[in-house]
Design a protein with these regions (language model features):
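Periplasmic binding protein-like
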Residues: 58, 147, 431, 436-441, ...
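N-terminal lobe/hinge region of extracytoplasmic solute-binding protein
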Residues: 59-129
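Gly/Pro-rich hinge or "lid" segments in bacterial periplasmic/extracellular proteins
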Residues: 93-96, 280-318, 324-327, 332-336, ...
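Acidic-aromatic pocket-rim loops
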Residues: 171-184, 188-198, 462-464, 471-474, ...
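Extracytoplasmic/peripheral linker and loop segments enriched in polar/acidic and small residues
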Residues: 218-222, 226-227, 233-268, 285, ...
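Append "and occasionally in soluble cytosolic enzymes with long acidic Gly/Pro-rich linkers
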Residues: 400-402, 494-626, 763-764
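Ligand-site clamp/hinge motif
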Residues: 405-452
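Long beta-strand-rich cores associated with HINT superfamily self-processing modules
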Residues: 735-765
Length: 765
């Protein structure tokens, strides 16, 4: 769920919805290793013989000190995990999974063949009964950094941590359809959920004590009410709630769900609890300021990670089967397109994070007592794994790592890595001054100019700083609500679609100018509602590829290749008039003079441009609004200084149009955003054909088939006129040219394959 705090953090058109395999996905950077076909042998030989030397300094935004492969949450903490762990399976530069890691898979990217290796092989078999089996085999030469061998028991232990009913990290393996998983998890619940569902007036203390019940409800009535009241007050401040007693209005604006009129702050807190299964750490996502952990007692907070058996005990997950010291199978009840991505999970050492005396596979004991992850939680300050580097210490904002001589793809070429907390303002000057070797400044035209000034010349390669750009794993868009922008109250009618396409056609024409002005060559205009970094994104060379909203109401192309900008703007307006007329508007002499019943002559698009026009899409919208004004139609661009107001406006369903951005995961599943039952289908799109395509794409693992389905689905979305894809921006990594051997940096970096993916091969000058 989105909240005001998240909205503020994401207001700068970076991302609205973050989807990731946090806690396990990031470690994939150490799960697959790659070398170009032309020098793979030489690289492999060098990596096993070269001596580690020197210290490499990396800039990090800030640590939370949760250095655990199971519980790391912040990006910087996850970076530490990436470098100290290996994942079971990895992905290539396109985000596609590498299933033959032991022998390696060769795949082409940007004209170069790269061979990817990893810790394991995985054979996926779709069975006749509808189940799917994942046959996993580990390399037999893997070692943890302390010299202990990596076996399938470590994998099984790690899986059971992620699947435990009390696990409250950010990985979501527990949501997959593994055979027997529901029975395993449902045979135990958390103490917090049990007490909450029993109710404050409960008199049956069979499963918990009266003292525990009283402590829980005392915490709810005190800290819980304060937590909810902060949300209400925040909504009152932004105008989304009437007053301090308007819990119902605030719950709706905060996207928590519905509460009846007269509901209290306590009712709101109980709604939040129900939304998150009374997992207090998960409920922290809804904070309006104060952490829930600061409002309720520590012992009560721990109730949400305390397991209680209910019903018949189920000691194991039937779908997880050990077949050898280095092999296992995992079986799901049905095909799940996301299951394979969950296998990017880290392989954590049982002997370090668990209790070896409690591991007995044959007797359903997996390294800890079910419902008790205390031994795992106790190891969050010093990670151990089989990754490129070993953790030394964390002190004064710096994480110190040492080269792992046992790393399966060869010992790193640098002896030490210091990961240093760095302010944004120092990420460039630090590299210039020589105190930082690699950093990731927020990239913009101003940053590019600053680097050019330091280097004395423009370009990616300079004498002081070398820059490497890659596409950001997300995109910016402009949306229209089908519920609020339609003709005659029917969002799905052809007239309603034509109305929205009339508006979008004009806005689309001004994207190039607006994005070039804001980003220069650090962003590109996109034409389909998907990040260009996804394997499912249509390519310009694909059959049927089209510029978004570039045809008129009769399906004819609006533009020609020799058109100048002004000609394109005029052509877009002419096409818009055709759409308006088809929607039922009265059009005469190039002017719109009247709207049909249930439609208007004016609509509004909300944009979070800080109240001063600072947004990539602001110029695009204002230019389009000015153009539409010339034909008698008013498009109001509402620049909202308070990001929470923007997010509340469309999450509550009130906005007619808005501007935001999505971030994508490896898997391009569209259910959440575009299915009629999707939780974040703010467009209110409801199309049977689209729903069927989305579900069909979930029912196959054939990427070519899925890509075709997704393209057809995206064409339906565009035909509804509810979304205009606008831009794909770049993000940068900068290197000290003087300190880092630039020739040893990973080539062809992508969001799925960064310089850290091959950090063991990087050398210092």
């Amino acid at each position: 769920m989105k909240n005001t705090k998240q909205a503020i953090a994401l207001a700068s058109a970076a991302a609205l919805s973050v989807g990731m395999l946090a806690g396990c996905g990031g470690a994939a950077s150490s799960a697959a290793t790659a070398s170009s076909e032309s020098n793979s042998t030489a690289t492999a030989e060098a990596s096993t013989t070269a001596a580690s030397d020197g210290t490499l300094v990396l800039a990090e935004t800030g640590f939370e000190s949760k250095f655990s492969p199971f519980f790391a949450a912040s990006a910087s903490d996850q970076d530490v995990i990436d470098l100290t762990q290996i994942a079971l399976l990895g992905a290539d530069r396109k985000g596609e999974m590498v299933l033959n890691g032991i022998e390696g898979e060769t795949r082409e990217y940007n004209g170069t063949d790269y061979t990817y290796h990893g810790p394991a092989d995985c054979v996926v078999t779709e069975n006749a009964d509808g189940t799917v089996t994942y046959d996993i085999k580990l390399r037999e030469d893997l070692k943890f950094s302390d010299g202990e061998p990596v076996t399938i028991d470590d994998v099984i232990f790690s899986m059971y941590v992620f699947l435990d009913p009390t696990y409250d990290g950010s990985a979501t393996m527990y949501s997959t359809p593994i055979v027997g998983l529901d029975e395993y998890r449902n045979s135990m619940t958390t103490l917090s959920k049990l007490i909450a569902e029993a109710g404050e007036d409960n008199t049956d203390n069979t499963k918990f004590t009266a003292e525990q019940q009283k402590a829980f409800w005392d915490a709810v009535n005190d800290g819980g009410v304060k937590f909810a009241q902060e949300i209400i007050d925040k909504c009152v401040e932004s105008g989304a709630a009437a007053d301090a007693n308007d819990a119902a209005g605030a719950a709706s604006a905060w996207n928590l769900g519905e509460l009846p009129a007269g509901a209290t702050a306590k009712d709101m807190f109980e709604l939040i609890g129900a939304n998150y299964d009374w997992n207090f750490s998960a409920m922290e996502a809804e904070t309006a300021g104060t952490a829930l952990s600061d409002l309720i007692p520590e012992d009560v907070y721990a109730y949400s990670t305390t397991g209680v058996n209910v019903g018949d005990a189920v000691a194991s997950v039937a779908g997880i089967v050990k077949t050898g010291d280095y092999s296992m199978t995992l079986t799901t009840t049905e095909l799940s397109t996301t299951m394979i991505y969950q296998l990017q999970m880290p392989i954590a050492p049982l002997h370090y994070y668990g209790d070896e005396s409690l591991y007995d596979y044959d007797n359903n004991s997996f390294g800890f007592a079910k419902g008790d992850l205390s031994s795992v939680r106790a190891k969050t300050s010093a990670p151990m794994g089989a990754g490129m580097f070993t953790f030394s210490k964390y002190s004064d904002g710096v994480v110190y790592l040492d080269a792992n001589p046992s790393y399966y793809d060869g010992a790193p070429k640098v002896a030490h890595v210091n990961m240093k907390e760095t302010q944004e303002a120092d990420k460039i000057t630090g590299v210039q001054a020589g105190t930082i070797d690699i950093s990731d400044p927020s990239y913009s035209l101003e940053v590019a100019d600053q680097i050019a000034d330091i280097n004395g010349a423009e370009g990616e390669d300079g004498p002081v700083i070398t820059t490497r750009l890659k596409d950001y794993r997300g995109y910016g868009y402009i949306a229209l609500s089908s519920k609020n922008v339609n003709v005659g109250g029917d969002p799905s009618s052809q007239a309603s679609k034509d109305l929205r396409k009339a508006i979008m056609t004009v806005i689309a024409a001004y994207r190039d100018e607006g994005i070039d002005s804001y980003y220069g060559d650090t962003a590109t205009v996109i034409n389909y509602p998907i990040s260009n970094t996804s394997w499912a994104a249509p390519s310009v060379t694909d059959d049927g590829y089209q510029i978004a909203y570039s045809t008129d109401v009769d399906g004819n192309e609006i533009y020609t290749s020799d058109m100048k900008s002004e000609d394109k703007y005029a052509a877009a307006l002419q096409a818009a008039l055709g759409y308006f007329e088809a929607a039922g508007y009265t059009v005469a002499n190039g002017q719109i003079t009247a709207a049909p019943a249930g439609a208007k002559m004016e609509y509004q698009i909300n944009i979070g441009a800080s109240g001063n026009g600072d947004h990539p899409s602001f110029q695009t919208l204002t230019n389009a609004a000015a153009a539409l004004k010339t034909i008698g139609f008013t498009l109001t661009v509402n620049d909202m200084a308070n990001a929470s107001d923007l997010f509340a406006s469309y999450q509550s369903g009130a906005a007619e149009g808005w501007v935001a951005a999505w971030q994508s995961t490896n898997d391009p599943d569209m259910y959440q955003l575009y299915h009629s039952q999707g939780a974040t289908n703010y467009y209110a799109i409801n199309d049977t054909d689209l729903d069927e395509l989305i579900m069909a794409a979930r029912a196959t693992t054939d990427q070519e088939v899925r890509k075709t389905m997704y393209k057809e689905a995206m064409e339906i979305i565009l035909d509804w006129g509810v979304e205009l894809p606008v831009y794909q921006r770049s993000e940068a990594t900068i290197f000290s040219t003087e300190r880092v051997n630039i020739d040893t940096i990973a080539k062809d970096q992508t969001p799925y394959w960064t310089y850290k993916s091959e950090l063991n091969n990087l050398e210092l000058n």
